Each structure stands twice: as structure tokens, then as C-alpha cells.
């Protein structure tokens, strides 16, 4: 599937099973040939900033990972049956290279490496201002929700 116009938040909500406060994709700019470019706008209003860390707010690495996992599901657009959900099955080679703070725009890039028999893998990268914030491979299982 190739995306000609960006998916706005209402379209993202139709595609993902997640809801507030766990929707970590705000927009999908492109999907083509198993590759996705999506966006998470990071604001001070995120609930996790109250505790991580009150005097120096930093987006937790596990939530950057979750944002990449959610973006990865758009690599499968058109390949999943209605009612199927992608479940996180593993993470390989995760590296966190810079802090993500309020005001950052987190660009999420995912490339589908394979999808066979309900198991898949994406290579992912999160960037802020063109600088890599995190990179990893995400393994997932697709099953009925």
C-alpha cells in the first residue's frame, strides 16, 4: 500500500487499537513498500512527565519503543485482517542515543523486514531534528484481538 496523503489523528485512531493516554503516533506521513514515516509530537502535557523526571522531563525509552512499535503497525497496512492486532513479541539491539524532551517532534521510521505466519520484524529509528534518538528491531505477533 502506498499513502498519497498523510494520515491525521482521526485516521490513526481508526487504525490503532490504542487510546489516550497510550496513542503515541499523531500522524503518518508516508507508507510505501513496507516503510513508514510517522510523527509523535512530544508535549509537556504528557502524563509520564509528571514522574519522569519532575525537574528534567525526559520521554522514557520504553515509550519511544512503544511509539516505534505503533508506527510499525502501519507497515502492515492492508496485510492484516479486520480484528487483528499486532502484539509486541521482542526487541533486539535497542540503543538510545539522545534525550527526547517536551517540544521535540519525534520522527518515527519503520521498515518491514518480514511477515510470515503471523510473526514479523521491523527495523526502526526515532529521530529528533535529523538526529537519531533511538534505533532497534521490533518483533511482533499478529493475532485476533
From Swiss-Prot:
Q: What is its main location?
A: cytoplasm
| Keywords, ordered alphabetically | Cytoplasm, Lipid A biosynthesis, Lipid biosynthesis, Lipid metabolism, Lyase
- Cellular component, GO annotation: cytoplasm; membrane
Q: Where in the cell is it found?
A: Cytoplasm
Pfam families per record: FabA
CDD domains (UniProt xref): FabZ
Tell me the GO BP annotations in alphabetical order. Answer: fatty acid biosynthetic process; lipid A biosynthetic process
- What is this enzyme's EC? 4.2.1.59
Where does the record place the catalytic residues? 52
Provide the catalytic activity annotation: a (3R)-hydroxyacyl-[ACP] = a (2E)-enoyl-[ACP] + H2O
One annotated GO molecular function is: (3R)-hydroxyacyl-[acyl-carrier-protein] dehydratase activity
Q: What does this protein do?
A: Involved in unsaturated fatty acids biosynthesis. Catalyzes the dehydration of short chain beta-hydroxyacyl-ACPs and long chain saturated and unsaturated beta-hydroxyacyl-ACPs.
HAMAP family from the UniProt entry: FabZ
Query: What does the similarity note say?
Result: Belongs to the thioester dehydratase family. FabZ subfamily.
UniProt name for this protein: 3-hydroxyacyl-[acyl-carrier-protein] dehydratase FabZ
This chain's source organism reads: Deinococcus radiodurans (strain ATCC 13939 / DSM 20539 / JCM 16871 / CCUG 27074 / LMG 4051 / NBRC 15346 / NCIMB 9279 / VKM B-1422 / R1)
Please name the gene that encodes this protein.
fabZ
Amino acid at each position: 500500500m502506498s499513502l498519497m496523503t498523510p494520515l491525521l489523528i482521526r485516521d490513526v485512531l481508526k487504525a490503532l487499537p490504542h487510546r489516550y493516554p497510550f496513542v503515541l503516533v499523531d500522524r503518518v506521513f508516508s507508507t510505501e513498500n513496507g516503510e513508514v514515516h510517522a510523527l509523535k509530537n512530544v508535549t509537556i502535557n504528557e502524563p509520564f512527565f509528571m514522574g519522569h523526571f519532575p525537574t528534567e522531563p525526559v520521554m522514557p525509552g520504553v515509550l519511544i519503543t512503544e511509539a516505534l512499535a505503533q508506527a510499525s503497525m502501519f507497515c502492515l497496512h492492508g496485510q492484516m485482517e479486520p480484528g487483528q492486532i499486532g502484539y509486541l513479541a521482542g526487541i533486539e539491539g535497542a540503543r538510545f542515543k539522545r534525550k527526547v524532551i517536551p517540544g521535540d517532534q519525534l520522527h518515527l521510521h519503520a521498515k518491514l523486514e518480514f511477515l510470515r505466519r503471523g510473526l514479523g520484524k521491523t527495523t526502526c529509528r526515532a529521530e529528533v531534528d535529523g538526529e537519531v534518538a533511538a534505533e532497534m528491531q521490533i518483533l511482533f505477533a499478529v493475532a485476533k484481538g
